[in-house]
């Protein structure tokens, strides 16, 4: 029996399975408790159980494998990892581990890890000699992640506009600057769908901090990737713990030369959570932001990089502006110059119900010549010169009208040439 397969089943199937196995009074229990009871019953029959999770090492030296399905929240179905195993395999917080597990003995509360099969989807012996993430060499992104699907659909317009005005590469540190109701969540869904379709080798994680529960469900159903969330009814400590688990997991995968993409909604809310959690330093900036509160969110955002030795970590985060909160403005100002790609959304365009509501003149990617071919770059510059004299709303309306007549950006450039 596999622990992961059980976690992916809906609660109705699990309750039916519990009934078949003769476990009673489970209808009012939490999903994790039902899984725990099923595994315990299954283990008594002497069959092997396998499980996996992301390691979180606690201060006492031992650790637990947390589940991404539960957004790395501590639960009864977590798997205990002993300090001797952590030392033997040189494990760190964020390592993704698959292995055989055993049921809890008398007086124990958790399942325990018996044998490690893989670490970060690699053989355990390969994981011992990995170079630490902080010691790897960061570079500008050089490999492009195309956003367009090439099917000419209206959903594809967002991807095509991003490709034209702010191309995204592997290792990009991007900021989507968004006022309320400008369509940032839908844009993130589109970006996630495009990355999953055009770059299936990429490990995609969507991290939702302080979001509405219904948006989390929608994201889980539309995105082919890992969706980790901490909703607005959770305490700030929980937001921080989730974000730190996600970034540690991403770093460990990059050490194994994997390409990882994190889509974060939103970095403003994460910074607010850190501001609440950290001990007061006594120095307070404008808007009530503690002087040291933004160090860790900056470390999170700054982890995005293209790695010379192989692998990359891309972070596309949304920053909230025009919310009426001075704190949000201060947080945005602090993050403003740190990214190497910026995509501002415009409230005026969104109010006219024109989507994507991208302000083309202000958006762009640093060193875009490393991501695009020379002829394409020349065409993009000509397009910018053409759109620059126009008003922001007129520019995006003009571009969308022209894109709708063609299926791909190459076709669009050819039609431009003919005119």
From Swiss-Prot:
GO molecular function, one term: ATP hydrolysis activity
Binding site for ATP: 169-174, 181-186, 212
Region feature RNA-binding 1, mapped onto this chain: 61-66, 78-80, 108-110
GO BP of this protein: DNA-templated transcription termination
The keyword ATP-binding is annotated on this UniProt entry: yes
Keywords: ATP-binding, Helicase, Hydrolase, Nucleotide-binding, RNA-binding, Transcription, Transcription regulation, Transcription termination
Residues carrying the site annotation RNA-binding 2: 326
Source taxon at top rank: Bacteria
EC number: 3.6.4.-
Gene3D superfamilies, per database record: 1.10.720.10, Nucleic acid-binding proteins, P-loop containing nucleotide triphosphate hydrolases
Region of interest (RNA-binding 2), residue spans: 284-288
GO annotations of cellular component type: cytosol
Cited Pfam families: ATP-synt_ab, Rho_N, Rho_RNA_bind
Residue stretches making up the Rho RNA-BD domain: 48-123
Recorded family membership: Belongs to the Rho family.
Subunit comment: Homohexamer. The homohexamer assembles into an open ring structure.
Function: Facilitates transcription termination by a mechanism that involves Rho binding to the nascent RNA, activation of Rho's RNA-dependent ATPase activity, and release of the mRNA from the DNA template.
The protein's name in its UniProt record: Transcription termination factor Rho
The organism's taxonomic lineage, starting at the top: Bacteria, Pseudomonadati, Pseudomonadota, Gammaproteobacteria, Pseudomonadales
């Amino acid at each position: 029996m596999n622990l992961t397969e059980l976690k992916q089943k809906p609660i109705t199937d699990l309750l039916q399975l519990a009934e078949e196995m003769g476990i009673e009074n489970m209808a009012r229990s939490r999903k994790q408790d039902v899984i725990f009871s099923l595994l315990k019953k299954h283990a008594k029959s002497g069959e092997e159980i396998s499980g996996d999770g992301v390691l979180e090492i606690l201060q006492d030296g031992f650790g637990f494998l947390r589940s991404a399905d539960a957004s790395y929240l501590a639960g009864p179905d977590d798997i205990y990892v002993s300090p001797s195993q952590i030392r033997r395999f040189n494990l760190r917080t964020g390592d993704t581990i698959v292995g055989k597990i055993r049921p809890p003995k008398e007086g124990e509360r958790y399942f325990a890890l018996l044998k490690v099969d893989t670490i970060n989807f690699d053989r355990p012996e390969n994981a011992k000699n990995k170079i630490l993430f902080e010691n790897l060499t960061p570079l500008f992104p050089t490999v492009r992640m195309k956003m367009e699907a090439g099917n000419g659909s209206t959903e594809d317009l967002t991807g095509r506009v991003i490709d034209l005005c702010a191309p995204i590469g592997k290792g990009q540190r991007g900021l989507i600057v968004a006022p309320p109701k400008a369509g940032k969540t839908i844009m993130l869904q589109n970006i996630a769908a495009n990355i999953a379709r055009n770059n299936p080798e990429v490990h995609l994680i969507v991290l939702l901090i302080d979001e509405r529960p219904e948006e989390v469900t929608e994201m889980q159903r539309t995105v082919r990737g890992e969706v980790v969330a901490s909703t607005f009814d959770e305490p700030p400590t929980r937001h921080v713990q989730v974000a730190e688990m996600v970034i540690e997991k991403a770093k460990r995968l990059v050490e194994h030369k994997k390409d990882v993409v994190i889509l974060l909604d939103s970095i403003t809310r994460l910074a607010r959570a850190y501001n609440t959690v950290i001990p007061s330093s006594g120095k307070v900036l404008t808007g009530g932001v503690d002087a040291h509160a933004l160090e860790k969110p900056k470390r999170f955002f700054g982890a995005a990089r293209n790695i010379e030795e192989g692998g990359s970590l891309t972070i596309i985060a949304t920053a909230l502006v025009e919310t009426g909160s001075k704190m949000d403005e201060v947080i945005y100002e602090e993050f403003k110059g740190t990214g190497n790609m910026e995509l501002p959304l415009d409230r005026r365009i969104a109010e006219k119900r024109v989507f994507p509501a991208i302000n083309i003149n202000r958006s762009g990617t640093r060193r875009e010549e490393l991501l695009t071919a020379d002829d394409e770059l020349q065409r993009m510059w000509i397009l910018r010169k053409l759109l620059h004299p126009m008003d922001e709303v007129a520019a995006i309306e003009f571009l969308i009208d022209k894109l709708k007549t063609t299926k791909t950006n190459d076709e669009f450039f050819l039609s431009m040439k003919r005119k």
